[in-house]
Structures are given as structure tokens and as C-alpha cells.
């Protein structure tokens, strides 16, 4: 039966170009495997004092609460339920909001939307409705009893002990995506939790007896042993975080702890891979977002910015338009990042070099930092079905840059990101198969042929070698830019050799191949010692701090 179905599927794909289950195209994990842990732990210590209110969060909630009610049929996936959430949170238009909720009916079914599940994606709606139930369900002044009953009995459509990982109506052939599993099964689990906590003793809704607790625990644990499949995804990272925030706030102690650890893992990666909320990592899904170059488009940044405003509204946070919807969710939920996930976004200590593995068929994240800068590698696509979007290698400073074009960056070969292997980052050095791009507001203090030196803020020097098919960027702190350029050019006088090998100021020899196949790290060796270039085998979190 499954074979017949699969063959029919292929025929449909070939003849009609229909929207097929996402896993066929590589959007979902098809195999489970634990990555080596590496030598970096996930920090979870929390000693910081957080404010209960934030002027920024209040303004976000107020803006959403002031919006007219959106059409349920057309905008019920995300916009309409968020307006309801904001109104209840702001305690605004309560009678009208309750009346609106009571008039609603489910607008679809859960799971990925495709040919045999055309009404899918209702789990996006469920996630926000679940937030509403738990935040306001016991406050009859805000959520009337009849409204709560309608929410539980009509609108929250998933309950019981079924834990569905596969795309609906795919005969179990295709795994659904992480965000769909978390939204659907998290909402199912939490409806059970609500019913059990409010007097329903049926084993069907007991998450321990029906197996949901264990299945969800195992799934969440997998996200911190295998890593996220949809890492840094635009737009799906936002919905993954929203589902995790529900579980962290409203689950059992076990599930709350599991969800918090996943969030802490994600935020630790964000902290080490960003500088003052500038974050531009490689991502899996979606290709349509590959053209985005502004840092405000990062959905994770929307959450992080909102959380940090609860720490201190005077932090040096960038003034920019953020992904509005996710600032609302972050404003309403109690989770706050661990201490180190806050600290290391702004303070890089004496610097570090870190590598985050994402498993077979993926691309890693690679970052090297000094006290006041961060070099961010861009990764490599691993074939069309990998759904991986590589990014330029970027140098981040504490200068308030708002887009890639305001940073020193490099990529190559060509402008076709599918051809890039931008993994060439190592200990303050970056190389790529294309020229280095310098914003006009940076002017060199010295030029020697294809070499140039830039004296940047915070006593940072950037040395650049750039030609049509090769670029090199070296970053140092507290050196004389002109003298440093003279020293480095003297050590690397052979420009042909420079395209495969670099000698550092302390005589270390770094070899690289900027045309490496995408399954390999561009950096080959250090002082003749071969490095592990097979990125499929890299640990989850590995690195060295100075």
C-alpha cells in the first residue's frame, strides 16, 4: 500500500508540481542521531534580577491591543489570535474580546499543509490559543467561563495520547517539521494538562498514563542532543520558540525543565554567535528568505531584544524595526535567558573560537571573537534538498550596523549563494573564494597592492587582501595598523601561495582550500596538523576561550 502511494506521489510531483510533504524535500529530519556533546556546556544558572514590566514590552502589547480584530478566515493563522492575546493581556475591550472568541470555529486542522491536508497549519493558531487559555483561563474577569469552555471544548482541537510526528495523511512515510511537531504536540499535551488540573480524571488526559509526558520528554531531549534541524530558520524559529515558551511556562516540572534547556541551548548559541544583537548565521529554511540582509529580519533577535528590555531598558539595544509578532509573544511569557546568554552577547571576554555542529547533511556555525568584535562564518548549502541558506562571512563591531552591507564581509565564488562555501573562519581569520566587501564609510589607513589596513573603533585593526577570486580578512586588537600590515605582508609576500596558506604574526601556518566541497570545512591544517574538516561529524558545541 505504501509503495503504491509513494509511486502515485512521484507521478503527481512530476506531472502537476503539487505541494508535497515537506520531508521529501528535506525540510524535516528523516533520521535520529546524537551528536558528540563537545566541550562546551549549556549554561543555565540564573542570578540576574529581572523587572516585571518593560516599557518596550508594554508598547508592543499596546500596539497589538489597539489593532482592529482581524478576519478569522484569512488572518486566523497568526494575526487574529495574537490580537486576542494582546487585548486580554492589556485588559482592553474585554467584553468584545470574549464575544469574538465565542464566535470562532476551528479554521483548519493541524500539521503541514499539503495536497492531502489542504486545511493544515491550524497548529499555528492552537499555539497562541493555548497561551491565552493558560494565562487567563483562571481569571473569570478577563476570560469568561463560557469563553473558556468554548476555547477548551471547541477551538483547542488536539488532546489525548496520540503523539504524531508524521505529516498528516502521508501514511507515516514523511516526518513533519520540528515547528509543527512542537506546536501540535505541545498544544495537545497542554490541553490534557489543563483538563487534568481542572478536575478531569480520565486516563485519556493524564499525560503520564497516556504516554504524552515521556514522548514529549524524549522529543525535547533530542533537540539538545541532535540539535535543531531547523536551526536559525526564517520564519520557523519564531514558531518553535513560541511553542517552547508555552511548555516552559505551563508544563509539568519535567517538561518545563526540558523546554527551558532547549531554549537555553538556543540562546547560548545565539549569544556566542552575535554581538549586541547583530546575528546573521547560516540557516535551514527557507530559500525565499535568502535575500534578506538586514539584521532586524532575525526572528530570534525579536525575542532576545524583548527579553533584554526586561533586564534593563537602558541596555545598548539597537533601535530598529523588529519582527513585530514575536516581540508580542516574548512580552507576554515569563521565560528569561540564563545569565551567560545575556552576558556574552555584550562581553566577549578575551575572545574565543567556537564551532556548532548540526549533523550529517547540514552546515556548521563557526564564530571567532575578540574583546570588541565577532567574525561570523556563513556556512554552505548541502544540495537543493538540504534547504540550507548560507550567509556572507561578516565582521561585527559595536557600531550599530543594521545590515550586512554596513559590515566588512566576504563570500564566494560569485553571487550565487548555492555555490558558496563560507566556512573559512579560524582564530581571527576569514577566507573565501571571492573579494572582501568594504562599506564606503571605512577608509584604509594604508594600502599595499591588494592589501589594505583599516583602523576601526575600539582599537581594532582589520587587514584585508582582496582580488576577484579570493578574499582574506584578519582582525587584531591593540596593534598599530600600518606596522601590522607591514609585518603580515612580509610574512605572506607570495600572493599565489596566499590563496592556499597564510602565516600569522606569531608564525603559525594556516592552510585552507576556499573551493572545498561543501561537506568540508575550508580550513585544512594548522602548523601542518590536519584538522577535522568533516563537518558532518562535528560536536554539538565545541570551542576554546582565551
Language-model regions: role of each:
Residues 48-62, 70-78, 84, 201-202, ...:
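Catalytic cores of extracellular degradative/oxidative enzymes
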Residues 245, 257-322:
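Extended amphipathic alpha-helical segments with heptad-repeat/coiled-coil character used for oligomerization
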